[in-house]
């Protein structure tokens, strides 16, 4: 997969993840299969009425995204979350997404559906870092996490509690 599909170059994405204090951002890896979903109008869907299969790497990555966001929900709702905190959280989430992308070994049909969802995650992170209503970015990520749980097989998946 090419990260330019998400509207940013490698340098921009890696710079965005540089705010991670605990972990350095991994270098994005190229998928063996490349899809462009950002402007395709692709819609997230089920696999003939069933959830898409996942692998341990994707499940761990999505749990990490959720675990980055969950502890901050109270402060976000209370409107005490600062612009700097939004930017740092967005950077950590982007770092988790880069890890998901670099470890992706899903079959092409599952991968295509994942990419539809990843666009929403990256859009949410971008909104969290921009001037304006940063909470809209959080809402987009929460909705993407909910959509993940509804469309991808992940035993014991827990959505964000809010």
Describe each PLM feature range:
Residues 16-19:
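N-terminal signal peptide c-region/cleavage motif recognized by signal peptidases
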Residues 1-10:
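Bacterial N-terminal signal peptides that target proteins for export
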Residues 103, 114-162:
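Helix-rich interaction surfaces within compact, conserved domain-sized segments
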Residues 57-60, 64, 88, 92-95, ...:
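Charged, amphipathic alpha-helical oligomerization/scaffolding segments
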Residues 22-81, 160:
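Immediate post-signal-peptide N-terminus of mature secreted/exported proteins
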Residues 46-61, 78-85, 106, 113, ...:
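Non-transmembrane, amphipathic alpha-helical segments
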Residues 96-114:
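Short, solvent-exposed, charged loop/turn and helix-capping segments
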